[in-house]
Amino acid sequence: MEINKFRALSRRAQQLHYTSLNGLKRRCNNAHGAANFHSLKRATQTQIQKSQTKPLLKCGDSDIKEWNVAISSYMRTGRCNEALRVFKRMPRWSSVSYNGMISGYLRNGEFELARKLFDEMPERDLVSWNVMIKGYVRNRNLGKARELFEIMPERDVCSWNTMLSGYAQNGCVDDARSVFDRMPEKNDVSWNALLSAYVQNSKMEEACMLFKSRENWALVSWNCLLGGFVKKKKIVEARQFFDSMNVRDVVSWNTIITGYAQSGKIDEARQLFDESPVQDVFTWTAMVSGYIQNRMVEEARELFDKMPERNEVSWNAMLAGYVQGERMEMAKELFDVMPCRNVSTWNTMITGYAQCGKISEAKNLFDKMPKRDPVSWAAMIAGYSQSGHSFEALRLFVQMEREGGRLNRSSFSSALSTCADVVALELGKQLHGRLVKGGYETGCFVGNALLLMYCKCGSIEEANDLFKEMAGKDIVSWNTMIAGYSRHGFGEVALRFFESMKREGLKPDDATMVAVLSACSHTGLVDKGRQYFYTMTQDYGVMPNSQHYACMVDLLGRAGLLEDAHNLMKNMPFEPDAAIWGTLLGASRVHGNTELAETAADKIFAMEPENSGMYVLLSNLYASSGRWGDVGKLRVRMRDKGVKKVPGYSWIEIQNKTHTFSVGDEFHPEKDEIFAFLEELDLRMKKAGYVSKTSVVLHDVEEEEKERMVRYHSERLAVAYGIMRVSSGRPIRVIKNLRVCEDCHNAIKYMARITGRLIILRDNNRFHHFKDGSCSCGDYW
């Protein structure tokens, strides 16, 4: 009964499709009729599809053709299991049956099932081999495709073209050429595939040689080579080639117009636009996009308003112009009147709001999206991450996974960046594992995000291991490692990386020299740092900016050369900013130069009156000098100006759970155990020679109370908890939102020595590696 029903519906649908529609089409001679025709055609095709997906359950039917049609119908709608049930119930199989199953499996991503069925075929025809090879090529598994290709009993031009196109589309140009040269017979597809391979991989010299070696190229081939010149920004050669074309179509004109626009020659582009004998919506869109790329948004809008018709690309191009110019009000007005929006439209608006810091507007649009793609998720995650909403970014990443969103490199990169910001090393490692499992190569884009995550999370060794494995390294990769080792206090290692980078032929940039000067500062290499600073313009073309000067002030200040540092600031080609004055203030505190510290502080308070950190630095210097009256005055000044000291917090991640501590923390569920452990540890530290530095504590407090107050600082509580709960042999990683206090720094050195643990503390300035009673910072931070 089921098979008869299927036959009747199928015949009825086919009759309607091939007879009624053809007759109707002949009668549709106007635009309205054509629209009706296409509408009816779509409706009929839907009816056919529904009729062809009826299940076939009756056994013993001898009409193999109808069984094969049913298999094809199920496979087209992704119902592989139903197709397999039909296949198993067939009275017999033909090569068409097998090929339908194999191609269906491949279309639905079931490569193992396709290969299994292919291997089980009692007899394969040429179509079977070609289908299987094409499936591997589409999946970019060229190795498997090549294996099958080499053992084929016979090949036709389709077989050769499949391998040729596979190599061409995946950038294997030499392999594509090898296949091309071996082909016993070539057709237009073969020649165009190789030409496209050369063009897509920017091998224009080879493309031109191939083009000259043959006559009678089709227009599509001429346009392909023209597009290659444009892609390489060889606009002169593109124009010469364009002028030599005997026949041009709208694609030719659109390509050359785009080329001029992308090269910044917008007037020439407009002249070609006006001369174009035929213009379609893409011609107009190319010109609008050209204006936008050249920051001529008003001209773009004027042309946009004149367009005889617009498509989604046109609307999105104009929208992107407003977003790039951060004119979000105009973008919103355009967005609201758009007759058609696709996922790219929504993504553009979300990205625009996020980049302008309007994260709530971005999230509001994100929630309203009818459909999201990986770019949508990545844009929203990046928006949260870049605006400092780190935990929201991670929460959204987890939500994306739960909802089945497809991960891409951008979403991984944003999530890794967020892990770096909140120092979530364990989560970062899990993401690294997901990347490896997902088959993502550790190339520059994702690899650099991983490097930064490991460096910022205090795992410089794992960063180094990853760096060695990276397939491709760019200037960002090297800069990350140089800056990472520098910030961790291993300046000499950082400088070795710098020398290696130069040997690799990479030219240092601004960021490189900031990291190098910082490494010299942390290592105490004053003369070497001066040499780099005064020769980097001549040697590398890097002009000193405020960051480079700040590094030099830190270098000189760290060495106690405070007057030299101050004189350097006086001779700067621009006024020192608050960061540079803050560096001088920090150096003055370390070396006890109160007068220079006050000068620096006054400058900072004028620039950043609410910078509580600088008040604290100066207050600590006064306290260390016993100037308690000045401490009191400074606190009154802070109160009058409404400046509040940022509370200090420290946290540690243990088994994917973050434990946060404040000074004298009374809320942690294990506080009694932690305090008791600290009391016991404090006794052992004193026996080893530790003396509490209480000079920064208020002078009207008893000495014993002073010791108790510094003992329960947040960083010491976090370190103690880490010693208690992190298994032996693993480093203890603690983060503090402020600069570590002098007494805690000294105490943690003793804690590391007594317990034999490696303690890595990241404060708001740098990393401290405590081991065997010493710190990588050399007691200067």
From Swiss-Prot:
Transcription found in the keyword field: no
PROSITE patterns in the cross-refs: PPR
Keywords recorded for this protein, A-Z: Repeat
InterPro entries registered for this protein in UniProt: DYW_dom, E_motif, Pentatricopeptide_rpt, PPR_At4g14850-like_plant, TPR-like_helical_dom_sf
Region (Type E motif), start-end ranges: 580-655
GO molecular function: RNA binding; zinc ion binding
Superkingdom of the source species: Eukaryota
Residue numbers spanned by region Type DYW motif: 687-781
GO biological process terms, semicolon-separated: acquisition of seed longevity; RNA modification; seed coat development
UniProt region (Type E(+) motif), positions on chain: 656-686
The PPR repeat ranges on this chain: 63-93, 94-128, 129-155, 156-190, 191-217, 218-248, 249-279, 280-314, 315-341, 342-376, 377-407, 408-442, 443-473, 474-508, 509-544, 545-575
Family: Belongs to the PPR family. PCMP-H subfamily.
The protein's name: Pentatricopeptide repeat-containing protein At4g02750
Encoding gene, per UniProt annotation: PCMP-H24
